[in-house]
Regions:
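A common structural junction motif
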Residues: 72-81, 173-181
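An aromatic/glycine/proline-enriched structural segment found at the starts
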Residues: 117, 121, 125, 150, ...
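Acidic/histidine-enriched alpha-helical segments
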Residues: 33-37, 78-96, 162, 181-194
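M16 family metallopeptidases and their MPP-like homologs
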Residues: 1-18, 27-75, 92-93, 104-130, ...
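Short, charged, amphipathic alpha-helices and their helix-cap/turn boundaries
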Residues: 132-136
Length: 194
């Protein structure tokens, strides 16, 4: 999540999340969307302060097939330069629009007062116009390679899937996902008022 962003390139984790849903090596964005829809499933990737989350909703009878798509999204991202530029520009425009929101402005000011400007937690997950202008596609690939690791992953299942079925489906992760050490920095403490 945000905690692993370079302080000068805040928004990288968010762009990685968005890029993961922009197709795979074997599927264009439209083909991926259609494959998910054909299963009656929903897959989304979002960034929080301390995580990149892959959320999946599917019928239990489509669990294995849906997870195959999740694996494809996670292990075979497309990294299309045109999609990257489109998403980056979209995000910059969204940031510009958000400046007119009193709630958004208040939230940003509050975060800066609490954490201080040099603390990553005072930054918006989406980044800023300035930070996004510094981010290149290679920065996203670097974040992806060095920040997403099974050691820091957790899987939660709710629904009509047996433990044995879940273990069978997730077994492939052991061979596909390289376990790397990811050092999650401790954020600086928030400022306190006396």
């Amino acid at each position: 999540g945000l905690l692993l962003d370079d302080i000068n390139k805040v928004g990288s984790a968010n762009l990685v999340s968005r890029m993961l849903m922009q197709g795979t090596k074997n599927k264009t964005p439209l083909e991926l969307e259609q494959a998910i829809e054909d299963l009656g499933s929903n897959i989304s990737v979002v960034t929080t302060d301390d995580a990149v989350l892959i959320r999946v909703n599917c019928l239990s009878i489509k669990f294995a097939e849906t997870f195959n798509l999740v694996e494809e999204i996670l292990f075979e991202p497309r990294w299309d330069a045109k999609e990257f530029e489109r998403l980056k520009n979209e995000t910059i425009e969204s940031i510009k629009r958000s400046k007119t929101s009193a709630n958004n402005t208040a939230s940003m000011v509050f975060s800066k007062l609490i954490y201080g400007d040099d603390n990553i937690l005072s930054k918006s997950i989406t980044g800023s116009e300035q930070s996004l202008s510094l981010i290149a596609l290679d920065d996203l690939k670097n974040y992806y390679t060095h920040s997403l690791a099974p050691k820091n992953a957790s899987i939660t299942i709710a629904g009509n899937v047996s433990e044995d079925d879940a273990i069978d489906v997730f077994k492939s992760l052991e061979t596909k996902w390289n376990n790397i050490d990811v050092n999650i920095p401790q954020p600086k403490e928030a400022k306190t008022l006396s």
